[in-house]
Amino acid sequence: MRRTVITGFGIISSIGNNKEEVLASLKAGKSGIEVVPEFVEMNMRSHVAGTIKLNPSEHIDRKVFRFMGDAAAYAYLSMREAIEDAGLTEDQVSNDRTGLVIGAGTGSAHNQLVACDAVRGPRGVKAIGPYAVTKTMASSVSACLATPYKIRGVNYSMSSACATSAHCIGHAVELIQLGKQDVVFAGGAEELSWECATEFDAMGAVSTKYNETPEKASRAYDANRDGFVIAGGGAVVVVEELEHALARGAKIYAEIVGYGATSDGYDMVAPSGEGAERCMKQAMATVDTPIDYINVHGTSTPVGDVKELGAIKNVFGDKIPAISSTKSMTGHSLGAAGAHEAIYTLLMLDNDFIAPSINIETLDEAAEGCNIVTETKENAGLQTVMSNSFGFGGTNATLIFKRYNG
C-alpha cells in the first residue's frame, strides 16, 4: 500500500497566524481566548471566543478576496503557507495528480444574514451583489482555493461537524493510497461570527461562567468547566505519497500511519464514548508502535470530556499515554479543529515537546490517574502521536502520526 506523509502545513488560529507563532504559543501555554464585543452587544450569555488577530482582506488580492467569506480567507492564507512550507512549485501544485479536500463545519451565517437583510431594503435583490453565493455555499472553502491556486486534481469539501477537517485529512490519505492523487491539500476552516455563535449559546453548549476571565473559560478536565469556547480559523496540511516526497527532497514532518472514522449511532449531540473507542482502535490497527501522546478532543464540556476519557481508558487500560487538550488554549474551531489539532500535534512531534492542558485548577474526579499534562513537557521522547476529533451526530475521527526515520 502507498504510504503517506505530511510535508508541509499552514495555519491561522487564535494562538497565531503562522506555524512559528503557534509553536511559541503552544510551548508557552498561551491562551488565544478573548471577550468579543459583538457577543456582548447581541446580549449573548457567552461573551468569549478564540479570536483571529488579523484582517484577511489586508493579505489577499482584492479580486480573489471578493468571492470569500472569512472561513475561505483563513483557508486560503493557510494553504499559501502550506505550499511555501512544503516547497512545492507552481507546476507541482497545478497538475492532475494534486488535489484539494477542504471543509467547514458550518456555512457562513454572517454572509447569509447580510444577504437576507439586504433584500428587505428598497433596492431588493439588487442590494445583495454577485458574490453572496460563493461566500455562503457549502463548498466555499474548497472552491475559493481551487480556482486561485489552479488545482486540477480532486476539488471538493467534506463536512462532518467538529470532525470535518480530520476526516478531510483521512480522506486525503485514502485518495493517495488508492493511487488517485500524489499530493492532496487537506484541512478546514471556520468563520467566527456572532450569527453562528449565538446558535451554540442558545443550546447551552458554550461557556458562560468565565466572561470576566476569558483566558480561563476553556478548561477541559477541570471540575468547574461549563461548556466549550467557540473559535475560528483555518488549517491546511500537505498530504503526500512517500516516494513522491522523497524524490523531490521534501522535509517530512511525519508519516500518517493510522486513520479511524466511525459513527456512534447513539444521540444527536451526546457522545456515546463507545464510538470513540472503536475509532481509536480502528486507527491503531495499522500502527506497530506504542502511542506516546494523545491530543484529545477535550472541548471542556461536562459530558464529552468524561466520555472521551472513558474511551481512552478502555482502549489503553493501565497504559494511558500522556494526554492534553490544546482547546484549553485555543477554544473550539468547529470544522477547522481537526486540522488545527493535527498541526499542533505535528509541531509537538517535530519539536519533541507536549503542550499543556491549561486551566485545570480542580481536577475532575473522572480524570484521576489519566496522565494529563498540565505543564509544558520538553524532551518528551515522542515517536507516535494521536489526535482525536468528534462531532455532533456521533461522528468520530482519529489520526495517528509517526516520526519518519527513513
UniProtKB/Swiss-Prot annotation:
Protein name per Swiss-Prot or TrEMBL: 3-oxoacyl-[acyl-carrier-protein] synthase 1
Every Ketosynthase family 3 (KS3) domain range: 1-403
Assembly and oligomerization: Homodimer.
Compartments it resides in: Cytoplasm
Molecular-function annotations in GO: 3-oxoacyl-[acyl-carrier-protein] synthase activity
UniProt xrefs under SMART domains: PKS_KS
Organism field: Haemophilus influenzae (strain ATCC 51907 / DSM 11121 / KW20 / Rd)
Keyword entries, A-Z: Acyltransferase, Cytoplasm, Fatty acid biosynthesis, Fatty acid metabolism, Lipid biosynthesis, Lipid metabolism, Transferase
UniProt-listed Enzyme Commission number(s): 2.3.1.41
Family: Belongs to the thiolase-like superfamily. Beta-ketoacyl-ACP synthases family.
Top-level taxon of origin: Bacteria
Catalytic activity: a fatty acyl-[ACP] + malonyl-[ACP] + H(+) = a 3-oxoacyl-[ACP] + holo-[ACP] + CO2; (3Z)-decenoyl-[ACP] + malonyl-[ACP] + H(+) = 3-oxo-(5Z)-dodecenoyl-[ACP] + holo-[ACP] + CO2
InterPro entries cross-referenced by the UniProt entry: Beta-ketoacyl_synthase (IPR000794), Ketoacyl_synth_AS (IPR018201), Ketoacyl_synth_C (IPR014031), Ketoacyl_synth_N (IPR014030), PKS_Beta-ketoAc_synthase_dom (IPR020841), Thiolase-like (IPR016039)
Gene Ontology annotations for the cellular component aspect, listed alphabetically: cytosol
Pfam families, alphabetized: ketoacyl-synt (PF00109), Ketoacyl-synt_C (PF02801)
Active-site residues, record numbering mapped to chain: C162 (for beta-ketoacyl synthase activity), H297 (for beta-ketoacyl synthase activity), H332 (for beta-ketoacyl synthase activity)
Alphabetical list of PANTHER family matching this protein: 3-OXOACYL-[ACYL-CARRIER-PROTEIN] SYNTHASE 1, POLYKETIDE SYNTHASE-RELATED
Gene3D superfamilies: 3.40.47.10
Main location (coarse class): cytoplasm
Pathway in which this enzyme or protein is active: Lipid metabolism; fatty acid biosynthesis
Keyword Lipid biosynthesis: yes
Function: Involved in the type II fatty acid elongation cycle. Catalyzes the elongation of a wide range of acyl-ACP by the addition of two carbons from malonyl-ACP to an acyl acceptor. Can also use unsaturated fatty acids. Catalyzes a key reaction in unsaturated fatty acid (UFA) synthesis, the elongation of the cis-3-decenoyl-ACP produced by FabA.
One GO term (biological process): fatty acid biosynthetic process
